[in-house]
Amino acid sequence: DANGTPAIAADGRIRFDALTFWTDSGSLPPPDEDAGEVAGRDGRVVARGGAGQRTPGFVTGSPQEANGLGGRTIYYDRTSSSLGRLNVDVTTAAALQSDFGAATAAESAELIAFSRGLDVDDLDGDGERNEPRGWLFGDALHSRPLPLNYGSIGGYSDPANPAIFIAVGSDDGMLRMIRNTRAGGSDSGEEIWAFMPRASMGAQKVLRANGTGMQHPYTMDGAPVAFMYDKNQDGSIISGDGDRVFLYAGMRRGGKAYYALDVTNPENPRLMWTIEKGGDFSELGLTFSTPRVGLIDTATGPRPVVMFAGGYDVNKDKRGVIGSDDSEGNAMYVVDAETGALIWKARGGSGGGGGNVFEHAQLVDSIPSTLSVADTDGDGFTDRMVVGDTGGNIWRADIHGRDVSNWKLTLLASVGRHAGGAPSFETDRRFFHRPDLVPSKDGNGLFDAVVLGSGNRADPLDKGGSAYNFMYMIKDRRTSVGSGVDTGLQHVDFGDVTSNCLQSNGGCIVNLVHGWRLGLEEPGEKVLATALTLTGKTFFTTYLPFSGTGATACSPSEGAGRLYAVSL
């Protein structure tokens, strides 16, 4: 930890007496010793230290009602391509009244103040409202912190202390930019700015009410990704050199939108574009799919692009029923990284190829997964995307060449409810996570191993009547440009290695020409993460839900996890 002492306890969690690096130990509140808290330490208690404690105006002063007053700097999307200041003023309150769901402009102003972190309801009863609430950093439930290394800029001259900023989304409605260390080398963790899109403002009333029994609100819950371009490759991001840093983020269950910000200057963001459901993106569902960035070849040279799947349809939230076709989310997109303009998409339908839209009749299930992308011929351009959907189908999109009308979508395999026979709970397999794509070969030649596991992430605790889930390895032998012809492969076409017969001495024979499948035999066991293949071995984890409650009657059951290692 910050004091050089062991930070991790025997149970795998942070020790109560640990001090994290950004935390100011002298500014911590008195500990709750009954809960295990330690004086001068934040330890495993989230709402004591870290970046949350470093939020401007939290420890001293105030978050303030407006940017530029020594408190927080918060922006919102004034238009789809410009930022406004989220200030407590008459004009802003009136403009955002409907976005906040406020009955009056006065309530809208209160919700802006609440969003900025002010104690508008005097929760501590001291009569002061221009002070911080008890905690100002929402949960980063599914988002992941993204470190961005800007090198030697703005006073950061020591190579051992580059200018690193961290972007992360959270369910209080914000995408934050956090400073790692100061130019002099001391720890920071300070929030430089935050971005609250209009799409997440409606949740502020729920957060403010904080009522018993209210459902947890989701807002900016997606993991951000970045496109970084260091033109002269000097290790520093300097706008005058032609360098660029673009940041992209979705909302997962928080909404149906993607946002792109130019953060070439990490302290002065610019909104580049917004993609929302409608128009070219009429198929867009909840933006579960973390964007991928890459380059494609065009007549005018390399072109940066953003790639993502159509997202999640809440139709698949229904419990106790077999999955059915979705009305949104059944698509894949490639867009211009700088403008957000659609370059190509695949969607459900019977039209086939032509223009910048490819339709496939069997693309009827939403795709919450992040895409696996690849450069199959090593020319520096992304030319393939692979993904599974919530109907148990695995897809490959070939985006090779400059003519997008030749790009195509192929059904690699169908291992869920569509795979022959009447759909059943047992075959209602769903894919939520990015496949692991591994160039490989066997006695029949080269193939791309597509490794992915099934499991309904939207209902992780389900164990009764749930699908019999599997980990699959599919041998895709179209290692260069795909044919566009569906393989026809189904669940039964992959060798069943569940019994471990490949390691037995009994002469068990399994046909692995198309790949293999490994059954997850515990009730409700499911894959909830992407596999990793190293040196010919695939590692993956599973989740096992437990019945009953946790340590107390009101606490949840954590369940258990398993780690598997399987020879590819």
List PLM regions with ranges.
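Beta-propeller fold recognition
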Residues: 1-568
